[in-house]
């Protein structure tokens, strides 16, 4: 047992230590940039290697009209989404709570519970006064001392 144990490294010998891991910043989607990328890719696809400048100019004019058509389609889609959200015909009036409090589906009779609470408070108040009838007088005497 006099043998010394060889300490093995935690990392394998042939493994590389990773450099700093950079976190990617989260960005919101920017659809304008996406539209620009799409139009550029369409230009590249529709732009064959032509020798004449007239054909190139005609292709550029076509891509402008196509982008106008795409913009019109996007506008129509956005307006359709707005119309779907504003549709009030689907609201079921039986689900609306008229009492003004959230009950998570449970119907509560607030008048009944208020009466029950008042009754329980009266019982506890009467029990406290019966237990110590002179206690209320002592409190009034203490108040008189502080009023001076």
From Swiss-Prot:
Single GO cellular component term: extracellular region
UniProtKB keywords: Chaperone, Nucleus
Entry keyword annotation includes Chaperone: yes
Record's compositionally biased regions (Acidic residues): 80-90, 136-148
InterPro entries on file: Histone_chaperone_domain_CHZ (IPR019098)
UniProt biased composition (Basic and acidic residues): 70-79, 106-124
Ranges where the record places region Disordered: 1-148
Compartment(s) of residence: Nucleus
Domain of life, source organism: Eukaryota
Subunit details: Forms a heterotrimer with H2A.Z-H2B, stabilizing the association of the histone dimer. Also, with a lower affinity, forms a heterotrimer with H2A-H2B.
Protein function: Forms a chaperone-bound H2A.Z-H2B complex that acts as a source for SWR1 complex-dependent H2A to H2A.Z histone replacement in chromatin.
Entry protein name: Histone H2A.Z-specific chaperone CHZ1
The organism of origin for this protein: Candida glabrata (strain ATCC 2001 / BCRC 20586 / JCM 3761 / NBRC 0622 / NRRL Y-65 / CBS 138)
């Amino acid at each position: 047992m006099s043998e010394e144990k060889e300490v093995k490294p935690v990392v394998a010998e042939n493994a590389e230590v990773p450099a700093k891991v950079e976190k990617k910043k989260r960005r919101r989607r920017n659809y304008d940039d996406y539209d620009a990328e799409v139009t550029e890719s369409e230009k590249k696809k529709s732009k064959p290697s032509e020798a004449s400048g007239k054909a190139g100019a005609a292709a550029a004019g076509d891509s402008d009209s196509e982008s106008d058509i795409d913009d019109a389609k996007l506008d129509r889609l956005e307006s359709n989404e707005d119309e779907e959200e504003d549709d009030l015909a689907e609201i079921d009036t039986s689900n609306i709570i008229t009492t003004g409090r959230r009950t998570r589906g449970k119907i509560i009779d607030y008048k009944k519970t208020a009466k029950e609470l008042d009754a329980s408070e009266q019982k506890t108040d009467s029990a406290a006064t019966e237990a110590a009838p002179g206690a209320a007088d002592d409190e009034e005497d203490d108040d008189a001392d502080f009023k001076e």
